[in-house]
């Protein structure tokens, strides 16, 4: 693990997530069946203060060198919708970059403007905004939506949390690493498991939780490339 200190945006996001019960420590059963000592519930990102902190963290990653220049943020329904919207606003406030955002409907609308897409036209260079990549099924469905739009080109994915753990495919790689290799685009998180460990180490208040997370990482963890 890198010894590099956490930056202020990551610290602010982790502290806000813990304060609002979004990042929890305990014993949780994941969809994969694994018993995890921590859990991130993006469904609780509903307060204005927490959304503001989250949006600022997204904007910082979106303006980093790892994410190529882009035109539109795509937030897959449903959790990605609000995340894409607030990220677009925060990015403009931080950098002055004026980009569009859009999202999909789960069901096609046959009245009014119709269609399955809402917001900016799905064309040009697209970055997908999402919460947590687990099996990779949801992100592949989002990418399929882009493939149906011939003028859209995926250039990157930004997610809230990279669990940095081995996927279910047996490759020994994380879902994030598999998606990066399969689609040839960077997948950047606001925070990863290593960042959570660093925060627990530096706080000095979470010794029991730190030991459990370390054990989990030792068994399932994958180092980011």
From Swiss-Prot:
A GO cellular component entry from the record: cytoplasm
Pathway: Pyrimidine metabolism; UMP biosynthesis via de novo pathway; UMP from orotate: step 1/2
Keyword Glycosyltransferase among UniProt keywords: yes
Source domain of life: Eukaryota
Keyword Transferase: yes
GO BP term, example: 'de novo' pyrimidine nucleobase biosynthetic process
PROSITE patterns registered for this protein in UniProt: PUR_PYR_PR_TRANSFER
Ligand binding (5-phospho-alpha-D-ribose 1-diphosphate): 31, 78-79, 105-106, 109, 111, 130-138
Reactions it catalyzes: orotidine 5'-phosphate + diphosphate = orotate + 5-phospho-alpha-D-ribose 1-diphosphate
Coiled coil location: none
EC number assigned by the record: 2.4.2.10
First-tier enzyme category under EC: transferase
Keywords, sorted A to Z: Glycosyltransferase, Pyrimidine biosynthesis, Transferase
GO molecular function, one term: orotate phosphoribosyltransferase activity
Binding annotation for orotate: 39-40, 134, 163
Subunit structure: Homodimer.
Protein family membership: Belongs to the purine/pyrimidine phosphoribosyltransferase family. PyrE subfamily.
HAMAP family registered for this protein in UniProt: PyrE (MF_01208)
Role this protein plays: Catalyzes the transfer of a ribosyl phosphate group from 5-phosphoribose 1-diphosphate to orotate, leading to the formation of orotidine monophosphate (OMP).
Name of the protein this chain belongs to: Orotate phosphoribosyltransferase
Lineage: Eukaryota, Fungi, Dikarya, Basidiomycota, Agaricomycotina
